[in-house]
Amino acid sequence: MSRVLARLCAVAIAACLLFTTWSAATPKQAAALDPTVGYLMAHFTGESSTDQQIYLAHSTDGLRWTDLNNGGLVLRSPIGTRGVRDPALVRSPGGDRYWIVATDLCIACGQDWSNAINNGSRSLVVWESTDLVNWSAPWLLNVAGAIPDGRNAWAPEAIWNPDTGDYVLYWATNVPLNGAAKHRIYYARTTDFRGITTPQIYVSRPGNQEIIDTQIVEVPSGVGAYRYVRASRDAQITLEGSNSLLGTWTNLGNLSGIGLTGAQVEGPMWMKVNARNEWVLYLDQYASGRGYLPVLTTNPSSPSAYRLPASGSYAMGGTKKRHGSILNLTAAEQNRVLARWPAAAVNRIQSYNFQDRYVRHYDYDVRIDPNVSPAQDGQWRVVPGLVGSGTVSIQSVNYPGHYLRHYGYDFRLEANDGTATFAADATFRQVAGLANSSWTSFQSYSHPDRYLRHYAYLLRLDPVSDAQSRADATFRVTS
């Protein structure tokens, strides 16, 4: 008996040690990740069937973004409604697994908003990866089917909960409850995004007030009074704080003090700035159709600490950025992502009849100069056009998201504001050179009888009618 007891004790001790090792290592693995150096944004771009897919963008500073895959979609959903919106990027605590979890919704794919609200997909679309570049086939995760009369599942988010050792997955579902049919935030727990616990109400506003978009950020000790801050779009952009993901949340106020309410913006998206205690809360300017706007803060729990960025201090890239999420990247992750989806080549644009001069921007004006300094002011990426097929746009290297754009037939370097007018004015057809067919000319998309040309060294959009103007409108795209 004593020998049996000894063996049982040994087994019990080993099991305890194994459990202790596992339970201690799992939450702490997040702290063992290498330092983060860059940022990856997953998003959708608009309302067409192609726009409602997964797009990626990269940034080194969190404010100036470059579209990956030359602005093309990266993942397409072939399941459910065959479209996705509101993607959430999720990393495992150990950094060895990633998920994209998105709304299964495609307006313009045969479903209108009324059906999407009242009889939409009850599932989310999920992809899984071990390296951020090779993704599994997607699957549907039914999250609202277990909610009595749950009518859809929108805007998913997920965050690791160290208190329970799994993820809190939360989303919005339209449910008639207590006399009010409206969207509320539900949550469930999951370890693998294939199965979930029974959904519970997470956030519900009083009366008929809906809430659809909410995202949580974890804040380090010493910054504000709360470990977690939640930004939600209801009638306002409301901030709430808690020291436990599944505990009580305290209303901290909203962003109306800087002129932002739920009538103008939605889709709050947090980003922690690498290596310092600063945060960016991106908000989707849905009412004006301008895409994401960054709002800056050094204390997420204090509404008075938020400020709008200076003009020209951010650039969102060539595609419109709609509701998504941002993942801070380690150097290894960043290298993999950029190797898989490299940015377009960096080029200079040389004048045909002044071959010592190159197109450059200077104080947002555009001209041809010799000996361009700093060199990056004369470096460009010729990328797929912002509008039309078989077209190009010319994007600045040191001001990502800024393009050569004509206005009043004069050229300036301007940030893409997401409008159709900007897209047309910043798009060209790259044709054989008008003065030499081995060179290149840029025909305006919005004014096809006019070409990009220099006049007195300044770039203009003019008709071309003689040998001089043909030479002025001829360039070489070179390294």
Predicted features along the sequence, with ranges:
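N-terminal export and membrane-targeting signals
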Residues: 1-12, 25, 29
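Acidic glycine-/aspartate-rich tracts in secreted/extracellular proteins
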Residues: 246, 299-302, 364-365, 409-410, ...
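Short, exposed beta-strand-loop hairpins at the edges of beta-sheets
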Residues: 317-318, 461-467
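Short polar catalytic/cofactor-binding loops
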Residues: 43-50, 61, 353-357, 364, ...
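Short coil/turn motifs at helix boundaries and re-entrant loops, enriched in small/polar
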Residues: 59-62, 129-132, 190, 297-300, ...
